[in-house]
Amino acid sequence: TLLISRVNDVLWTYILIILLLGGGVIFTIRLGFIQIRGFKAGWKRTFGGLFSKKGTAGKDGMSSFQALATAIAAQVGTGNIAGAATALAIGGPGAIFWMWIAAFLGMATIFGEAIMAQKYKHVGKDGHVTGGPVYYIQAAFKGTFGKILAAVFSVLIIFALGFMGNAVQSNSIASAFHTAFGIPQIVVGIIIAVIALFVFVGGISRIAKVTETIVPIMACFYIIGSLIVIFANFKEIPYAFYSIVVGAFKPSAVSGGAVGATVKLALTKGVARGLFSNEAGMGSTPHAHAVAKVEHPVEQGFVAMTGVFIDTFIVLNLTALVILTTKSIPTGKTGAELSQYAFSTLYGKGGNIFIAICMFFFAFSTIIGWYFFGQANVKYLFGPKAVKIYSVLAAVCVFLGSLAEVDLVWNMADCFNSLMVIPNILALFALSKVISQVHKDYFKNFNKAK
């Protein structure tokens, strides 16, 4: 466990932060601050999809909104409750500022991921549409090297998300329900595994139906619950924002911050937790965006950016503000326990119940999203028939995860997750000219024609 933890530290402190932030800066400049120019278009398509007649997902793909809902299902997970709290506890309030920077730059990266996933999506002999980094990795690196790199990425994502990642998510639900309601973790594990398997075997249509229903409900529930706590402590809001901005550059100047926080700690923890949460550049969400039914790849690029904004600037931000306005950092707690404490300052024991319900929605939706990403790679490596075996194995991992000691599993998932960033981001760098061309084509030809 110590060795894997050390590998993760090296990856995040030196390699991934440079790759992901560097990629974000390159794509932001190359695409002319697309985060700002495409912001309105992204929200227009998102809300248009939310309130319009729902499309039916099938072998030809899913609607743009269903693809976003599946991506957000994966992005908004337990990290939004525990990850922000951990960053605050270790890096202090300034970590949130660096989360914002990482998310802003990440919006440009995920735009590139989504449009490449759309451009290189694959239609099988049976008419099923699939896609993801494996296809644009092969487009970026021709021949045997591209095939090997794509296969390595596939194996990493199947283990990181489909097996180990989902085990961690189910453990979060089981432990939260045990704390709040006293239900044995094995009982919770069986229930989650059965429900998950029911969704898995329903294929793309059932996954799309579940995510487009569950994501708006869970987002609204958490947003309202958080805003009530924040506004109950409204006098602390100005200082919370002050501590975030000042703490990013001078952590010692902020009272109520983390003991021993430095600028380096604030930056590394903020960037790492932010990127880990919104998944920009990780190569996970392109699987959902690839199967969206859109007229031009750039349209889904706009929608993908909205996902990062919702994950970080809304959900993660609310967790941070709840913790800061309730002055919970000096308690010495960390992770989900810190978030739980912050909510309980207003809700009492109801805070545990609130977090348990949110944990269920966030973690279960992530299980579905990550399964979907994993099965696309199982299909790529072993063919469509292997998906049935994978769905059963994934459900077994969901059950076992509810009982496991998760530190080792979490660290291994972290490690595989970190490693899969490298082939994905290198492929995006190699395809940066193509990304730029597709982007220019939309604004020059397609957008004017509409």
Q: Model regions: which residues?
A:
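Transmembrane helix-loop junctions in multi-pass membrane proteins
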Residues: 1, 30-35, 79-84, 161-173, ...
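N-terminal alpha-helical transmembrane segments of multi-pass membrane transport
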Residues: 1-74, 78, 89-95, 106, ...
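Membrane-interface loop-to-helix entry segments
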Residues: 19-26, 34-43, 153, 170-177, ...
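Helix-loop-helix module between adjacent transmembrane segments
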Residues: 27-28, 102-127, 134, 138-171, ...
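Flexible loop linkers connecting adjacent transmembrane helices
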Residues: 33-62, 86-96, 108-144, 329-346, ...
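Alpha-helical membrane segments and immediately flanking helix-loop junctions
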Residues: 54-90, 116-119, 125-134, 138-140, ...
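Selective recognition of specific alpha-helical transmembrane segments in multi-pass small-molecule
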Residues: 105-113, 190-204, 215-235, 268, ...
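Extracellular/periplasmic helix-exit of transmembrane alpha-helices
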Residues: 111-121, 125, 225-243, 251-258, ...
